[in-house]
Amino acid sequence: MRRTLYRLMIELTNGRFTSYILRKFAQSRLSSIIIPSYVKVFQINQDEMEKGLKEYRTLHELFTRKLKEGKRSIDTDASSIVSPVDGVFADYGPIEDAKTFDIKGKRYSIVDMLGNEERAQRYAGGTYMVIYLSPSHYHRIHSPLSGSVTERFVLGRKSYPVNAAGMEYGKEPLSKNYRSVTEVNSDGEHMALVKVGAMFVNSIELLHERDTVQKGEEMAYFTFGSTVVLLFEKDMIEVVQELKSGQELRLGEKIATRLAHK
């Protein structure tokens, strides 16, 4: 019953009109009135902001803010995989040979997430990692490794919450929501960076258009908090053992090690 009621309420409020109104408000000068309250409620660290608080003219500008130079360092070890965002580490684990994985008691299909069987097959037997971005986090997304961009594509039309309630009662939001995917070939092995849209505000803006990408390079930004899913091929990485669900991560922090292949 809870699941049914939850989904009904989301469907009734999560329409194009609602999304349009919220987006227009966030981009308007009128939204600047609530910026101080927003910063206070979500405890945003003003010392890290590239600009002073009064220089942000709209909520959208605050959502997509940059950091001051030097506030994040990218792990330089050639074998390291780094966190592409500031966020909360949600989970990691194996991708089954059936191209599925389980998180929070819900099974997700990589075929659904990536749109077809051919893409999903690359990651059978591999590893997934999920990082959640709240409204308080820095919303820009960077590359976790260096390599060649092999594909960029967008899937899904609407987005549902990716918070605790959304993960429990929603319709597989990580693989059904509006999402933007970038696949990178790094030394012959593939990684998929899946940027999952948030409810009401689907917008994910791509900033990187070149054929190659460097570890730590800026790739995109969310216009609100959301989630990033990383998919790695089989035997490509070993996740840092100290990582725990609920742990805060910072952009550039080492989250996994590339496995050496003879």
From Swiss-Prot:
The keyword Membrane belongs to this UniProt entry's keyword annotation: yes
Reactions listed under catalytic activity: a 1,2-diacyl-sn-glycero-3-phospho-L-serine + H(+) = a 1,2-diacyl-sn-glycero-3-phosphoethanolamine + CO2
HAMAP family associated with the record: PS_decarb_PSD_B_type1
Function: Catalyzes the formation of phosphatidylethanolamine (PtdEtn) from phosphatidylserine (PtdSer).
GO cellular component, as recorded: plasma membrane
Gene name linked to the record: psd
Principal location: membrane
GO MF, one example: phosphatidylserine decarboxylase activity
Any GO BP: phosphatidylethanolamine biosynthetic process
Active-site residues, record numbering mapped to chain: 86, 142, 226
Subunit structure: Heterodimer of a large membrane-associated beta subunit and a small pyruvoyl-containing alpha subunit.
UniProt keyword annotation of Protein biosynthesis present: no
Protein name: Phosphatidylserine decarboxylase proenzyme
Pathway the protein acts in: Phospholipid metabolism; phosphatidylethanolamine biosynthesis; phosphatidylethanolamine from CDP-diacylglycerol: step 2/2
Listed EC numbers: 4.1.1.65
